[in-house]
Amino acid sequence: MTEPRLKIALTKGRVEQQVLPLLEEAGLDCSQVRNKQRRLIFDSETQPYEFILAKGPDVTTFLERGAADIGIVGSDILTEHESTQYELLDLGVGKCQFVLASTADFDPVAPRRKIIGTKYPLITQRYFDRLGQDVEIIKIEGSVELAPLTGLADAIVDITETGTTIRENHLQIYDYLQPVSTRLVVNRLALKQQQAAIFDLVDRLATVVDTNNPKEFV
């Protein structure tokens, strides 16, 4: 009987580049993905895995609809899209922070209603709800940093790894909302049907993650 393939939806781009070495250290054959050319679906010739390369939001859709068994995607996408699938592992890469940023003259506690530009309206709304502040949120798909510089918004909520882009655009950080990293999530039905194979993969990846991110003992 042929062993069923685990379908792994992997966020293409930077997440893909950071995660492929982890998958390879865990023993997965990723040669087809590395030599992808223009393809987006890859079968391992030697192992029961199939890789699907997709944009982050689409990874969650593949999982929700059962088109993928495992998804590898940023926690920002999972939170913004309110994913209901099981999160099994923090892969320890793609580490960033959600920040509130604006120009030097921005007053974060001013009582007036603020306009906030962001790619993440749900996360932004929840943040200001916790603060008890009423804001207008404008969804921006491109360079969010432009919003306060052009007067489109008073401030922005965005992801930053080092803060360099924010500083280069003459903005400053006023608050840190929450950390972000790349997570491994699993379709609920797949976890029931292929539990042994999924947990075997998760265990191997967890060993790699622990090796690459040793804990500090005080």
Swiss-Prot record:
Catalytic activity field: 1-(5-phospho-beta-D-ribosyl)-ATP + diphosphate = 5-phospho-alpha-D-ribose 1-diphosphate + ATP
Gene Ontology MF, one: ATP binding
Keyword Metal-binding: no
Entry's EC annotation: 2.4.2.17
Pfam families linked: HisG
Keyword ATP-binding among record annotations: yes
GO cellular component: cytoplasm
Taxonomy, superkingdom: Bacteria
Pathway info: Amino-acid biosynthesis; L-histidine biosynthesis; L-histidine from 5-phospho-alpha-D-ribose 1-diphosphate: step 1/9
Gene3D superfamilies named in the record: Periplasmic binding protein-like II (3.40.190.10)
UniProt-listed GO biological process terms: L-histidine biosynthetic process
Domain notes: Lacks the C-terminal regulatory region which is replaced by HisZ.
Family to which this protein belongs: Belongs to the ATP phosphoribosyltransferase family. Short subfamily.
Physiological role: Catalyzes the condensation of ATP and 5-phosphoribose 1-diphosphate to form N'-(5'-phosphoribosyl)-ATP (PR-ATP). Has a crucial role in the pathway because the rate of histidine biosynthesis seems to be controlled primarily by regulation of HisG enzymatic activity.
Subunit structure of this chain's protein: Heteromultimer composed of HisG and HisZ subunits.
PANTHER family found in the cross-reference section: ATP PHOSPHORIBOSYLTRANSFERASE, ATP PHOSPHORIBOSYLTRANSFERASE ATP-PRTASE
Protein's name in the database: ATP phosphoribosyltransferase
Origin species: Lactiplantibacillus plantarum (strain ATCC BAA-793 / NCIMB 8826 / WCFS1) (Lactobacillus plantarum)
